[in-house]
Regions:
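Secondary-structure boundary elements
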Residues: 1-54
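Charge-rich, solvent-exposed alpha-helical interaction surfaces
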Residues: 15, 133-140, 166, 170
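Mid-length scaffold segments of soluble, non-membrane domains
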Residues: 54, 58-61
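Hydrophobic/aromatic-rich core segments of domains that either
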Residues: 61-143
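Alpha-helical and coiled-coil interaction segments, frequently adjacent to or embedded
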Residues: 89-91, 142-174
Length: 174
């Protein structure tokens, strides 16, 4: 599927599934596919244009691309970040990151969760309400994180070119 062929929310998912891999570009413009090694040290967020150019993204970029594409076809949507809280000055660059961004969209009186970056849960999930969707998603990540609380916040944009630490700080203050 090509970008100009996207007409429906299912087309958005199909486009991302056909064209976007899980990965990221570092500060040296090197690609990292299916690995988070050195992520806290050298990751930077990408623009929508860069995501489309490199055909990859973490949950942050993939959700931002879904948001962009859903907006283009006038489908209401919201971006969220679910994570174990880290203060603004958190400095352990060796620790695994415990964050997942996701998107909900709204059609026909229902709420849908479009999941692509989490390879174990790829797909579109239907819910009766926003609160039901958020609870199901957050509960999944709390269980995955061994019961650790995972505060979830809506966010409205992805600043381009910032580090993981800076993105975390941005989410802290949204």
């Amino acid at each position: 599927m090509k970008l100009n062929e996207i007409k429906t929310s299912k087309d958005v998912y199909r486009f991302i599934d056909d064209n976007i891999a899980y990965g990221w570009i570092d500060i040296n413009n090197q690609q990292h596919l299916n690995t988070m090694k050195e992520f806290r040290r050298i990751y930077r967020t990408m623009s929508v244009e860069e995501i489309l150019k490199y055909k990859l993204g973490t949950c942050i970029e993939q959700v931002n691309l879904m948001h962009y594409l859903l907006n283009k076809i006038n489908v209401k949507n919201k971006m969220y970040c679910c994570r174990i809280f880290e203060p603004d000055d958190y400095g352990n660059l060796e620790e695994e990151e415990h964050m997942h961004c996701f998107i909900l969209y709204y059609e026909n009186g229902k709420v849908y969760h479009m999941e692509h970056p989490n390879l174990d849960r790829k797909g579109i999930y239907e819910y009766n309400s926003e609160s039901e969707a958020i609870k199901a998603i957050v509960d999944y990540y709390i269980e995955l994180r061994g019961g650790k609380e995972s505060p979830t916040k809506e966010f409205f944009e992805v600043p381009v070119g910032i580090s993981f630490k800076e993105f975390n700080k941005y989410i802290n203050h949204v």
